[in-house]
Amino acid sequence: MAISVAASSSMAVMVPRVPAVSTRCSAVPYLPPRSFGRSSFTVPLKLVSGNGLQKVELLKTRASSEETSSIDTNELITDLKEKWDGLENKSTVLIYGGGAIVAVWLSSIVVGAINSVPLLPKVMELVGLGYTGWFVYRYLLFKSSRKELAEDIESLKKKIAGSE
């Protein structure tokens, strides 16, 4: 008898109480069923309050009947083929491309090794933060230094393009 009284009293404690009147509101979005024939799509939002449910139109999008693509894949492939056929030293391009892939692979190995050392990643973060602060102070903080940076970038562009 004592066990049943203890069990019933513990069950009474474990059952949560729900207030009879809820005064809070919550927004619960739901997904409507898919309709393929519609030209517009509205996402309704149900607001739950003590008085009842209210529907609010949140977002309305319209589907376009024409399909436009900013990049045509056939045009891109033909353009790449024309540029590849126009190259004289194809082996040089392949060597540089392979070298770039190997360089990225090796740099990822080095970064992984640095991250495995316990204190070194934090030191590298501090070095990067210090360099960023120096760069902002040296080139971005004052108007004259921003002009100097723009001139340096333009001269570098000319050197790379071969017009200087």
UniProtKB/Swiss-Prot annotation:
Residues 140-164 form a coiled coil. Its main location: plastid. GO terms for cellular component: chloroplast; chloroplast envelope; chloroplast thylakoid; chloroplast thylakoid membrane; cytosol; granal stacked thylakoid; plastoglobule; thylakoid. Keywords: Acetylation, Chloroplast, Coiled coil, Membrane, Plastid, Thylakoid, Transit peptide, Transmembrane, Transmembrane helix. InterPro entries: CAAD_dom, CURT1. Residues 115-116 are lumenal. Pfam families: CAAD. Residues 1-62 form a transit peptide. This is Protein CURVATURE THYLAKOID 1A, chloroplastic. The keyword Repressor does not apply. The chain crosses the membrane at residues 94-114, 117-137. The modification N-acetylalanine is found at A63. The gene is CURT1A. Residues 63-93, 138-164 are stromal. Belongs to the CURT family. It is a multi-pass membrane protein. Disruption phenotype: No effect on growth behavior, leaf coloration, grana stacks or photochemical efficiency of photosystem II. Curt1a, curt1b, curt1c and curt1d quadruple mutant shows disorganized thylakoids with extended stretches of unstacked membranes and broader stacks made up of fewer layers.
